[in-house]
Amino acid sequence: PEPTSIENAYRFIKSSFYRQIRLYSETPELRDLVEESMDRNNRHGIRTPRELLLHLKELGPEMSDFAEQQTERYRPSLILNQVRSNNDIKVGHAMETACLKYFGLSVDFRGYVTNNDLVRRSVLQRKPLMMQSPDSEIGQDLQRLLGNILQRQKVPPS
């Protein structure tokens, strides 16, 4: 995975968590605070979901209890694309750890898809990869990944 892709994944996880709170909150003050927190230069200095939760605790139980419930409900799955080595696979586990440590959010690393020229060829030919090469290495990756998702299994650390 490219560094830019990793950064984008962290940004997506953060913003989708904030959107979840805004969407389900019935408290205008909470929605406004979350909206403001999405700006890195907000007046409260909130930069992460963990910092948002700490700030909400200072404001009282109504908003912080709701946000804590949303934190427990929010459980995104992570899939790595274009993996080239075992070190790339370790990035998935590192991202799980970093999300919990810095964001206070649990993320499940479900698997990966290896880098493979068959994908590009499939896109250029506008034919589904699984129709062209279901038994290829990438086809097996996709089948394994689908099984992990359906069975809600995480990738064990190597």
Q: Positions of the model-derived regions?
A:
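NTP-binding/hydrolysis catalytic cores, primarily Walker-type P-loop NTPases
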Residues: 106, 120, 124-158
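Beta-strand-loop-alpha "switch" segments that mediate conformational coupling across diverse proteins
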Residues: 73, 82, 100-128, 142
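Hydrophobic transmembrane alpha-helix bundles
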Residues: 2-20, 111-119, 144-156
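Short, surface-exposed, charged/polar-biased interaction segments
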Residues: 30-37, 99-100, 116, 130-134, ...
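Conserved catalytic-core segment of NTP-binding enzymes
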Residues: 1-108
